[in-house]
């Protein structure tokens, strides 16, 4: 398999970099997206919540992007693909979600990393009277909250790591 998105270059790590070949070379050709330590701050502070995550797909099926931050928006499978878009305003996406699910804005919960880069999004969500669930770290686990109603998270949005975004997209697909 070949790493198409990973952590090596961004974190100055010697392994799991884009283009790295893994395996014995005699199996099927696959693409790999990997985040060896999701929740690095949890590990550094000896807290629970970190995990290792990866996505594997047929060659050419995973986004091959530079190791960088990316804008993200995730919802459960009850929202038709393409209905919401990172290029739409926060308000437009919330309105679309509200229309699709017949939920009042005050009943919608958005999960987002508590980062200064998200201050405008958080302010906009509060202005719209949307519930905001702030998390300190772990945008993979935060985004996956939308996949099960027991967590009461409707939307995950914000800016986070590229590998995590590709992995979450594969998991939710």
Name these PLM-found stretches:
Residues 2-7, 32-34, 43-45, 64-65, ...:
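General beta-strand structural signal in soluble alpha/beta enzymes
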């Amino acid at each position: 398999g070949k790493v198409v998105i990973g952590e090596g270059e961004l974190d100055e790590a010697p392994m799991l970099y884009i283009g790295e070949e893994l395996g014995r070379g005699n199996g099927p050709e696959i693409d790999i997206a990997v985040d060896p330590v999701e929740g690095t701050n949890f590990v550094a502070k000896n807290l629970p919540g970190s995990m290792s995550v990866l996505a594997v797909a047929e060659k050419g099926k995973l986004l091959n992007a530079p190791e960088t931050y990316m804008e993200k928006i995730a919802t459960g499978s009850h929202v038709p693909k393409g209905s919401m878009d990172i290029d739409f305003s926060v308000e437009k996406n919330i309105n679309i979600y509200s229309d699709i699910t017949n939920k009042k804005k005050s009943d919608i919960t958005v999960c987002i990393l508590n980062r200064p880069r998200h201050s405008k999004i958080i302010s906009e969500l509060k202005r719209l009277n949307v519930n905001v669930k702030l998390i300190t770290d772990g945008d993979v686990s935060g985004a996956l909250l939308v996949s099960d109603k027991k967590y009461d998270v409707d939307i995950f949005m914000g800016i986070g790591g590229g590998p995590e975004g590709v992995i979450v997209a594969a998991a939710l697909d």
